[in-house]
């Protein structure tokens, strides 16, 4: 099924503007980046930010409350310091507000930043956040919560659930590999998927993925055609079962040839519903959210404004 939508045409980037009058920083205090939060504060003050709101949180799940406080205080730009989990929580709170987000990638994988070309370089990330091109980007929404990079269930959800904070904190991306090896024998379950109102898949499956961007967990380029501004989500389902199947599948995915795998099917859509015969763990942007037998997923076009590198840079 061809569900590709017309992509919004690129427009000429706006000239660099002075920093917003009211800038809020929402920071995961346990994450490190460059010279740390002291350097960030110094750079923002030196850049001439008119009013600086500052919020630090010990866990990403506490970030939405701080984002809402920033919006209530008149924030014109929200800078997010942390990884994909922190970005997801803040994006969920900012969705539909029209207030831009600047990303300061201080996490383990920083996949949303990677897909947008935002470097792990504090001075440059700050420059992009203050003066970069502001793009209206899509978000996905699964069971009522927004995601920026991807969501998944089955093998993917189990992997994320077991790559717990302690393991991930100590070993970074290796944590995903380690836990992945523990789940390659994960069971397949009867899975029914409808895309934009039409039946698309009805068979045994081990994993279902929804992508807003191309590069997902583990740095794998799973969705070649994904763009975060095209009004659609990529939908992938895998029937791989066992170490040999998964080795072949992940090998193709790592090489950017997902659609060549005999164990993978991919399509695109705006609204997706999934039913499993047994509850499966699902995750979004690297954060596990428990088990469900039904998933309701949709794209929310232009939900989030993000400060991105200028193509001319």
Predicted features and spans:
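ATP/NTP phosphate-donor binding region
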Residues: 1-78, 88, 124, 313
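ATP/nucleoside-binding phosphotransfer catalytic cores, i.e., glycine-rich phosphate-binding loops
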Residues: 2-11, 18, 25, 195-197, ...
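Catalytic core of DAGKc-family lipid kinases
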Residues: 24-25, 38, 46-47, 55-57, ...
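N-terminal glycine-rich "phosphate-gripper" loop used for MgATP/nucleotide binding
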Residues: 80-84
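Short glycine/serine/threonine-rich phosphate/pyrophosphate-binding segments
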Residues: 85-90, 111
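Glycine-rich phosphate/pyrophosphate-binding beta-alpha loops
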Residues: 152, 156, 209-224, 288
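Gly/Ser/Thr-rich active-site loops/lids in small-molecule metabolic enzymes
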Residues: 167-175, 210, 218, 224-245
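A generic structural signal for short beta-strands and their flanking turns/coil linkers
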Residues: 187-189, 204-206, 229-233, 268-272
